[in-house]
Amino acid sequence: MGCVCSSNPEDDWMENIDVCENCHYPIVPLDSKISLPIRNGSEVRDPLVTYEGSLPPASPLQDNLVIALHSYEPSHDGDLGFEKGEQLRILEQSGEWWKAQSLTTGQEGFIPFNFVAKANSLEPEPWFFKNLSRKDAERQLLAPGNTHGSFLIRESESTAGSFSLSVRDFDQNQGEVVKHYKIRNLDNGGFYISPRITFPGLHDLVRHYTNASDGLCTKLSRPCQTQKPQKPWWEDEWEVPRETLKLVERLGAGQFGEVWMGYYNGHTKVAVKSLKQGSMSPDAFLAEANLMKQLQHPRLVRLYAVVTQEPIYIITEYMENGSLVDFLKTPSGIKLNVNKLLDMAAQIAEGMAFIEEQNYIHRDLRAANILVSDTLSCKIADFGLARLIEDNEYTAREGAKFPIKWTAPEAINYGTFTIKSDVWSFGILLTEIVTHGRIPYPGMTNPEVIQNLERGYRMVRPDNCPEELYHLMMLCWKERPEDRPTFDYLRSVLDDFFTATEGQYQPQP
């Protein structure tokens, strides 16, 4: 290969493509027949750019036209129904419900923001994922429902205005993996992965690599599968009547009460936590719930609504695979390799880093309070509830329900709960993850755990636990709370750990 400045023989057109340091132009194969434009300011742009998650866009749509990605049946007064593919004009863009007019019927009403995409753009394409990180692309493509050759195109995290192609592949050594290719821009508006062949648009690029791998790891088969999104909760529906909820299936019972799968107003699938009567003050609960509903993050279970008359109901988003501690023991959970387990730990650390940033405390962090979606996304539940419990069996150190094995020594001995006691609990949670749901301190009673901790004992490294991960656990279990790491640090280490275990890019054949 060569450019105007060198003839270094290399052929790697993956995301770490070589660009000449002097002319800033891609190093083109010497035997290539393609004639790229003469250097005239076409260097690859490299400013860093950050992207938000799947939230409503902050800036107004330029032409106010959107296209429906899914059909929507109205469920509230003032809603506007529409069919998939229908075009609408946005009249007011605020929050998660936008006022719109159908160009088909002329009717006006409110629509859920996540059911539509900007018209005359890439956003309606099933293979285009606008605000998706590299790591989340891997999570989505490796989720159930996707297969060899499943793919997506996303905005580049490192280069503004550029895109990356992510493809699911099978590796003989690593099993199912995701490989990433940088899509480069031409001055004339075209695109290329390898300069041997360029395309006027991304549609042409997708069409070409669907018909032939042409140097990629595999042919593109079908776009990454996603489920129809849950419509946003209606903002005014916070304190709701009990009659609006139908409890369908009892999912389990925990320290606070029972958990049910149910439906709100007959159409929205939700999880309902029914708290035991007398377990907490309704007034104290409502005050805390108003704080909890402000904590919105992709790694936190979304709190939708409450019933404030006893028995208190907490209505949240429904997570198909239930609690992490139970899921890890299922056939699907047992099959998860250490890479995926570490990814789950990284997701939880990400959510706890947000709680840390908000100066909030969980107080009961363990695998039983982590929920798992159908795409194996992990979300933190029950944050803040432990503080409100008025049951002595739960709050007293000797209480039968007190989670001794997850609780930091200062919280056991003095009732001192801080974000640093949450860090201790996170270290215990890591042992649950790598052992597929084993109870911590196997073979020990709660009093024995307390006695051993006072003597400086720490849990031994579980079987199959990487040394680096055990080192992270030991940092979480430092005696002095101030010596324990932050969740932001834990998140960064686990993110790097996850990336490192995925393996480096391989040269394209």
From Swiss-Prot:
Enzyme Commission numbers on file: 2.7.10.2
Post-translational events: Autophosphorylated on Tyr-394, increasing enzymatic activity, this site is dephosphorylated by PTN22. Phosphorylated on Tyr-505 by CSK, decreasing activity. Dephosphorylated by PTPRC/CD45. Dephosphorylation at Tyr-394 by PTPN2 negatively regulates T-cells differentiation. Dephosphorylation at Tyr-394 by DUSP22 negatively regulates T-cell receptor signaling.
Cross-link (Glycyl lysine isopeptide (Lys-Gly) (interchain with G-Cter in ubiquitin)): 99, 276
SMART domains hit by this protein: SH2, SH3, TyrKc
Effect of mutating residue 272 to A: Reduced activity
Gene knockout outcome: Mice show a dramatic reduction in the level of peripheral T-cells, with 5-10% of wild-type levels. T-cells also exhibit a 10-fold decrease in proliferative response.
Protein source organism: Mus musculus
Keywords in alphabetical order: ATP-binding, Cell membrane, Cytoplasm, Isopeptide bond, Kinase, Lipoprotein, Membrane, Myristate, Nucleotide-binding, Palmitate, Phosphoprotein, Proto-oncogene, SH2 domain, SH3 domain, Transferase, Tyrosine-protein kinase, Ubl conjugation
Main location: membrane
Domain SH2 intervals: 127-224
Domain SH3, chain residue ranges per copy: 61-121
Activity-regulation annotation: The relative activities of the inhibitory tyrosine-protein kinase CSK and the activating tyrosine-protein phosphatase PTPRC/CD45 determine the level of LCK activity. These interactions allow rapid and efficient activation of LCK in response to TCR stimulation.
Sites bearing Phosphothreonine, chain numbering: 159
GN (gene name): Lck
Outcome after substituting residue 5 to S: Abolishes plasma membrane association
Family designation: Belongs to the protein kinase superfamily. Tyr protein kinase family. SRC subfamily.
Catalytic residues in the record: 364 (proton acceptor)
Impact reported for residue 505 to F: Causes thymic tumors
Effect of residue 20 to S: Complete loss of interaction with CD4 or CD8
Protein name per its UniProtKB record: Proto-oncogene tyrosine-protein kinase LCK
Catalytic activity reported: L-tyrosyl-[protein] + ATP = O-phospho-L-tyrosyl-[protein] + ADP + H(+)
Residue ranges of domain Protein kinase in the record: 245-498
